[in-house]
């Protein structure tokens, strides 16, 4: 039976599918502006990074389609689960990432949501989409490596 993947203590959500769908070329850490009910919900582990992306609008960076479930004990002032959330980066970093994403084929994909010194951070990856044959080849390589490791383990 396969071992269950364990998250590191500060990791709240991870986009594992992104590493399968994209070639990650560069990563950068960014803060995220959240409401009170959002951070409470995130700490409970009810955040989902699947299908989310970041983009530059009017000189600011926003993360879109990141789903944070409504906080159960929240009242009528609870947050919208799919609202755009502002990322906290220096102006030079925003300009640099904006230039990279204007190139054809590049996207900003959130890879991980975690806590660092009590602050919620997002690890963004500058990524280029993989073609279907690249995904198949990666799965074949992974299976071959697993078989080799299993054979070596059985041998000794």
UniProtKB/Swiss-Prot annotation:
PROSITE patterns: SSRP. InterPro entries: SmpB, SsrA-bd_prot, SsrA-bd_prot_CS. One of its GO terms (biological process) is trans-translation. GO terms for molecular function: RNA binding. Signal peptide: none annotated. The keyword RNA-binding applies. GO terms for cellular component: cytosol. It comes from the Bacteria. Pfam families: SmpB (PF01668). It is found in: Cytoplasm. Keywords: Cytoplasm, RNA-binding. HAMAP family: SmpB. Belongs to the SmpB family. Required for rescue of stalled ribosomes mediated by trans-translation. Binds to transfer-messenger RNA (tmRNA), required for stable association of tmRNA with ribosomes. tmRNA and SmpB together mimic tRNA shape, replacing the anticodon stem-loop with SmpB. tmRNA is encoded by the ssrA gene; the 2 termini fold to resemble tRNA(Ala) and it encodes a 'tag peptide', a short internal open reading frame. During trans-translation Ala-aminoacylated tmRNA acts like a tRNA, entering the A-site of stalled ribosomes, displacing the stalled mRNA. This is SsrA-binding protein. It comes from Staphylococcus haemolyticus (strain JCSC1435). The lineage of its organism: Bacteria, Bacillati, Bacillota, Bacilli, Bacillales. The gene is smpB.
């Amino acid at each position: 039976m396969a071992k269950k993947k364990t998250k590191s203590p500060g990791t709240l959500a991870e986009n594992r599918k992104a590493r399968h769908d994209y070639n990650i070329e560069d990563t950068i850490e960014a803060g995220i502006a959240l409401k009170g009910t959002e951070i409470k919900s995130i700490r409970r582990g009810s955040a989902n990074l699947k299908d989310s992306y970041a983009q530059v609008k009017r000189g600011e960076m926003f993360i879109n389609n990141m789903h944070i479930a409504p906080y159960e004990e929240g009242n009528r002032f609870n947050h919208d689960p799919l609202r755009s959330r502002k990322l906290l980066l220096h102006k030079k970093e925003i300009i640099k990432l904006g230039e990279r994403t204007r190139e054809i084929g590049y996207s900003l994909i959130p890879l991980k949501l975690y806590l660092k010194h009590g602050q919620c951070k997002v690890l963004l990856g500058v990524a280029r989409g993989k073609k279907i044959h690249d995904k198949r080849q990666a799965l074949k390589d992974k299976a071959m490596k697993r078989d080799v490791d299993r054979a070596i383990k059985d041998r000794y």
